[in-house]
């Protein structure tokens, strides 16, 4: 029995070593995180059951595997960057708390506060500062030595290069990751399996310009050798220094609240726009952290509460294709419905033709499907051991299934694309959905189903048609249609009217220009400040072979802007939209940071004469203010129009400053001058 256990341990270590090399060394994992965790758990159970075989454990306390054939110099961390112990159940978390309390010899009435933070699914890094100046950025590597990625990290947006009032030597740690939106753009030109691999591969590019174009994000979560008393103080100071920190954090001494936070994050994670794979619980007191110390592999004062498996096995019934907003034709797996994490899944993305060929996916196969918060789940693997003789290879279409145009593959890309743009009905439909989305014009009540309804009835054919919808609906009785009533129609019309005032950055994003996401749209808007300036500059750009320089924007984004303005149909849509919308000027970062209302809470009440409530709200937000719906002790200013109501009375009772509309207009003008 003992010999069998020893052989099983050797086999598990061989598998773990193999997968660690693929994951940490080559950024090309063969198995999912869940499958890897199962191997780790099996090894732990084996060692618990047969403690005598631990002497044969030749792969213990391993943090990571150094990057193979690394082109980046290796550097040593100030302190080891250890991995975290995992918890998979509430009982595991309770055992962790019990273990910590016992180690610290706490009494039942003694308080043990936890910091509950999102566990980012990206690539760990450390940033070293000497005298407040950024001198080095490194990957985690094997936990003791990492790769020097300083040059590439310098283009990470928002990573401070200089800190005020910092310790002489400070090491800040965090995670580099990629938003889903940026990964989807990249997927057409690079063959990364997921956002985490894309982030790890992108930060290791030899060309810094490519790194910048990949639009990587980061979050900082700890500061080594700092003198702060708590993790809460560390996060606050990191934020004040200008680091990006995750604001979704809870500090509590009650395990019930920590678990409730975990459950809340688990159910809402799909709205984050990036991948997380659990919640990290840390002992808040840094003094307690020092007392607890670490094992060879992980700190004793923290644990990662991992999300449950989001994978399942089901039959691939068929493969269809769909056309996206930018013309990318994506193969979709039509599945035998399966419950994954409490959600019935019948469709999943196959990414592109290269992925189908690489995985050798065939119709009739048993496939492994992963759902990790994405809008469309993914086929991550094929179970070829159970493949029958009746499976069929998929033949990718040569023409667009929507408009019939011949599909093209641009140089350096893996995706096939329909280039008919707005004359392709499928692309036009997806652009309308994008246009009304939260970061676009944010039209409530005009979701995917409503848009498809109006498109199918010939009422919307392009984004410009949205603002003619009210007129077209006259004489049409929607009450007879399923899902529509007098109130829902009235609410929709009101929402469209309210959206007619829009900030320039939101408008640019809403157009759905390729490579122009939320961040890029903001950079463009801040550069040109007004719609007129932007429109004129882009038209001039199409008439020259020269390019323009917009701080923070890469060549692909500039070329995409130029291409968009080179299409006559797009210019016609812009002309129609600019006549119907009130596109507000964009404030510069300097204006937002230095304005008198930056960081202050403003409330509007009553009827405004010179602008809508939406326009006033956008004005305030563009200058860095926070707009609230109700007056409280935290309110800095109340702008009162005619018939102000109870908010005015409450403001007076709380000694909140109250001004009229004319004073507000003057305040905005002064802030922008």
From Swiss-Prot:
Coiled coil residues, start to end: none
Molecular function in Gene Ontology: DNA ligase (NAD+) activity; metal ion binding
Residues at the active site: 119
Family as reported in the entry's similarity comment: Belongs to the NAD-dependent DNA ligase family. LigA subfamily.
PROSITE patterns: BRCT, DNA_LIGASE_N1
GO BP terms, alphabetized: DNA repair; DNA replication
Residues reported in the UniProt entry to bind Zn(2+): 400, 403, 418, 424
Protein name as catalogued: DNA ligase
Assigned keywords, A-Z: DNA damage, DNA repair, DNA replication, Ligase, Magnesium, Manganese, Metal-binding, NAD, Zinc
Pfam families in the cross-refs: BRCT, DNA_ligase_aden, DNA_ligase_OB, DNA_ligase_ZBD, HHH_2
